[in-house]
Regions:
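Conserved, mostly hydrophobic/aromatic
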Residues: 14, 32, 92, 100, ...
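Short, well-ordered coil/turn segments that N-cap beta-strands
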Residues: 6-10, 36-41, 61-67, 94-99, ...
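Catalytic pocket-lining loop regions of alpha/beta-barrel enzymes
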Residues: 117-231
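Short, acidic/polar
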Residues: 20-32, 78-92, 214
Length: 231
């Protein structure tokens, strides 16, 4: 038998534009209805015309989708980056973006969604300050994927408990400028501390599923930080 419905309808806080065709999205809505899921947060990490396209597509089909944008990293290495990126963030918000995500730093800094390139800017870099402060002003939560599970940073040998995943997602710490997991988490926590009025969501348990004691201490000391339990 189908399990009884939960006391409150669940919200899927971490999804992506896995389907971006009308038929696929309508089937998705049918699945949501069948399982009493109230809403899905669609992390597009997009901006500009691509964000507008995805926003119109999803929200034009169902109000179950809340569509989030990304940061415009186009001018990340130029002095005008903060001003230009904030302007685009405001535009996306006016369009209907409910938040920002999923931003990613696995060790080499924020990843540009259009190219997959990691640009060496960690989220505690002052270049992001104006963006995170604008998120606080607009009430836009920020979802950040910091690091990967610890096994992705360990040697690929018989002692690696997560070898089956690590062999596909291994992170080479010999690449110059790469932070290990502790370094990525520290950079993220510094960012959270620097922007106490901004709501942050740490994806995947902040990738500290090997150290819940540390995760608990971080959560206890940062009231503006939430986690999602997606894996």
């Amino acid at each position: 038998p189908h399990p009884p419905p939960p006391p409150s309808p669940p919200i899927d806080m971490h999804s992506h534009a896995y389907r971006n065709d009308e038929a696929g999205i309508r089937q998705w809505v049918k699945t949501l209805d069948e399982n009493n899921i109230e809403k899905v947060i669609v992390h597009t990490k997009a901006f500009g015309e691509e964000f507008d396209r995805l926003y119109d597509l999803f929200t034009g089909i169902s109000d179950k989708f809340e569509v989030w944008c990304g940061f415009d990293m186009t001018k990340w290495d130029q002095p005008e980056f903060p001003e230009c990126a904030v302007k685009e963030l405001e535009r996306c918000f006016a369009k209907g973006a409910g938040g920002v995500g999923e931003l990613i730093d696995k060790g080499l800094g924020e990843r540009i969604s259009s190219s997959g390139r990691e640009v060496g800017l960690h989220f505690n870099d002052p270049k992001f300050d104006a963006l995170f402060e604008k998120c606080a002003e607009l009430g836009m939560p920020v979802s950040i994927h910091s690091g990967d599970p610890i096994w992705m940073y360990e040697p690929l040998d018989s002692h690696n408990d997560g070898y089956m995943n690590a062999k596909h997602w291994w992170i080479d710490l010999s690449v110059p400028g790469t932070l290990d997991l502790d370094g990525v988490v520290d950079a993220f926590v510094e960012c959270v501390e620097r922007h106490p009025n901004t709501t942050f969501i740490a994806c995947h348990l902040l990738n500290l599923n090997h150290d819940y004691a540390r995760l608990g201490k971080i959560l206890d000391s940062h009231p503006n930080l939430w986690i999602d339990i997606s894996e």
